[in-house]
Amino acid sequence: WVFDSQINLKGGYSEVTSRGVSKWINSERKQGDSDYMRIIAATIDGRLIALESATGKHVASFGKGGIIDLKEGVGEIQVTSPPAVINDIIVVGSTMGDNWRFDYPPGVVRAYDTRTGNLKWSWDPIPRKSTDYGFNTWIGEKVQKTGAANAWAPISADPANDLLFISTSCPSPDYYGGERKGYNVYANSIVAITASTGKVAWHFQTVHHDIWDYDIAAQPLL
């Protein structure tokens, strides 16, 4: 079979690459069943798609007819890396053209149930509340509108320890930090997240207050 995701080729995307797809084995099915294995793909026009690997058809029970609109509630994001699949959870980051303005969409990482597509958790790499860790590392009146710090590189997964390892990028805009003074935790960081809860286990920031577009572009190697 051949599957065409029907992407709008005139969408004016900031990125036009796709680094692959992922798979999930359904432990509630046996090999040979149409829904034994699913192909999980994310598109540059911001959709998460689940297909039956045997037929190439959308999984009707996933999201809305096999599709989730990742832009809903977030904004003009794209996805260029394959989703991570860990312990019946799909985890997806995003990419965006983050050097055009400061108020870009947030670089949220989201986790979905592999069977239903229901949202399990979302994590914003920019602390928005005073009770969030790292909130005091973002200083400025416009910080609440600062976007990006997104995870556009592939995400690594350690199922045995229930951990995800996420590489984040610089905040928006890339080359001017006057509206986001401070260290800007969790931008430009390797972040370990508990997959089942979406809570941060630990992080290491490679660049404090990035104004050079020093995204962590590589997938963490375990």
Model regions and ranges:
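Short Asp/Glu-rich motifs
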Residues: F102-D103, D132
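Extracytoplasmic/lumenal domain signature
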Residues: W1-G11, I25-R29, L48-V74, V108-K145, ...
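Repeat-blade elements of multi-bladed beta-propeller folds
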Residues: E15-R47, G75-R101, V108, V143-E179, ...
